Amino acid sequence: MKQLTTVLLTVAAAFAQSSDRLPVTDAEKIADALRAGPAFVSKDATVLDWPSVPGGEYRLLRKGSNEWTCLPAIPGYSHDEPGCFDPIFLHWMQDSLAGRTPHIDRIGISYMCFGAWQSKDGSSGHEFHVGPHVMIVSPTQDDFQGFNRDPSNGMPYVAHLPHRTELYLVMPFRQWDEEQAHE
């Protein structure tokens, strides 16, 4: 039993180290970004790297042939959270992160098939994994009125980017516990 426990702890430690290691090289960033979306989105998607300064230029890592753009983990974040974005969501996100009010004329969609980490109240520091999800932005914030605001219950919920008020809808499509149980 002691030997089994040692093996399990070693495997768990190795998994924790590998899953929290953020991509560094361009090849790692491309691979990380492409796992954010389903294959029909990511296989032909453009891959960008995050700007080196807020509001700066995104760096092209790979030119794609469809309208989707995928980005790797955000530098400086404590977790690996790659995403794939349609042109509307990408524009909305780039404007929001640069401190500009986004102006979009239709719904935008994003995939985060690797999931994301959230704190329940936005400030407690207690984080949990949201699991794979789709996000939707709308030109009309009223579209999100009445939606759940609790990201911990597995239901669709509304959220906003740090230091911003523009809302987006997060729709988990698989519970994290279910995903771990099947691996």
State where each predicted segment sits.
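Positively charged n-region of N-terminal signal peptides that target proteins for export
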Residues: M1-L4
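Primary mode marks residue(s) on the alpha4-beta5-alpha5 output face of response regulator receiver
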Residues: S18-E183
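Hydrophobic h-region of N-terminal signal peptides that target proteins for export
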Residues: L8-Q17
